Amino acid sequence: MFDPASFVKEIGPQLKQKVGNERVLAAVSGGVDSTTAAVLAYNLLGNKVIPVLIDTGFLRKNEAEKIKAYLSNVLPNLIVVDERETFTSEIEGMEEAEAKRKKFRELFYSSISSLMRKFNAKYLMQGTIAADWVETQGGIKTQHNVLVQIGIDTEKEWGFTLIEPLADLYKNEVRELARYLKLPKEISERQPFPGPGLLVRTIGKLTREKLEVVREANDIVEKYLDPFNYSQYFAVSFESDGNFVILDGIDAFLYKARATGVKGDVRAYGNIAKVECSDINTAKSFVDTLVKYDITHVLCSLDERSNGKYSIAIRAVITEDFMTADYARIPKEVLEKISSEILQKIPNVKEVLYDVTSKPPATIEFE
């Protein structure tokens, strides 16, 4: 049984001894992991800790402003650094999921390295948790914040030393710690948000238009699903191009866009399939059949129109530890409201779908 008070009592002397009189840059994304790590360090080390939020251009709608407001009491010295144009222009046009994640990692730590020099900091504090390095070591997908665990020498590569106080904790334990540290509920109970943000929800080639489409769609999805307290819920966008196939008697539409999955504890990068479902609650039979092929995510069609070039998929899951997850059984009328608003408010969206794939065989994020 995890005891946050004991954890803080144990980690405190270790952190103080390691840091000494040096400065620590704490990378904050606004998610529960990185923010908890930063607040833990700030409480223990005071103004030696410089918390920084890098706005990469892949944050949710108005997110940087919201995070700064949420954390005004627990991280009063939080600095927001605007790197939106740098990240977007460097990754724009890139298509393959792992290539995008790795480029993001390169840009992120290059930016961090510059900030470390600017603030004369020796240590970088990160919110890496157990699920991050398990997935990266297993080759399922690159988590941008997993470095030492896969043999990257941060001292040699970027000139700083890593501190990861949460690396042995799972998400539910981090939340307990966040509550103990009195983080605002908007953070402690916040659903996870990947470090690369909307980059990994803009499936396939990154374009500025598609990025803005998913930013707006994600905002609508969160608005409707917030009251349900699902473990994680969001939207992804991808081009609607593809072709119809028949697999084991099932009529399916295979998109050209591909997505990450996990089969037998190893990474799979396969097709996204659409099927017509009369009821999302009974869609498991479709999934069990289709994932035997090169398919990682199975989507149920919700609503569509004749024009438009983008598909929006809604993803909502229920999980304890994020190592496995089941898709949420969202009420039909709620899905209808979400679909209707997305099609009404966002130009160039052709259809709205719902992901009915568990983890495994899918990963929670598409990339």
From Swiss-Prot:
GO CC terms in record: cytosol
Keyword field: ATP-binding, GMP biosynthesis, Ligase, Nucleotide-binding, Purine biosynthesis
Pfam families (UniProt xref): GMP_synt_C (PF00958), NAD_synthase (PF02540)
Catalysed reaction, written as an equation: XMP + L-glutamine + ATP + H2O = GMP + L-glutamate + AMP + diphosphate + 2 H(+)
Highest taxon in the source lineage: Archaea
GO MF terms held by the record: ATP binding; GMP synthase activity
SUPFAM superfamilies: Adenine nucleotide alpha hydrolases-like, GMP synthetase C-terminal dimerisation domain
PROSITE patterns (alphabetical): GMPS_ATP_PPASE (PS51553)
EC assignment: 6.3.5.2
Record carries keyword ATP-binding: yes
Sequence ranges assigned to domain GMPS ATP-PPase in this UniProt record: 2-190
Protein's pathway: Purine metabolism; GMP biosynthesis; GMP from XMP (L-Gln route): step 1/1
Residues the entry annotates as binding ATP: S29, G30, G31, V32, D33, S34, T35
PANTHER family per UniProt: GMP SYNTHASE [GLUTAMINE-HYDROLYZING], GMP SYNTHASE-RELATED
Record's function text: Catalyzes the synthesis of GMP from XMP.
Self-association and partners: Heterodimer composed of a glutamine amidotransferase subunit (A) and a GMP-binding subunit (B).
HAMAP family documented for this protein: GMP_synthase_B
Name this protein carries in UniProt: GMP synthase [glutamine-hydrolyzing] subunit B
Organism: Saccharolobus islandicus (strain L.S.2.15 / Lassen #1) (Sulfolobus islandicus)
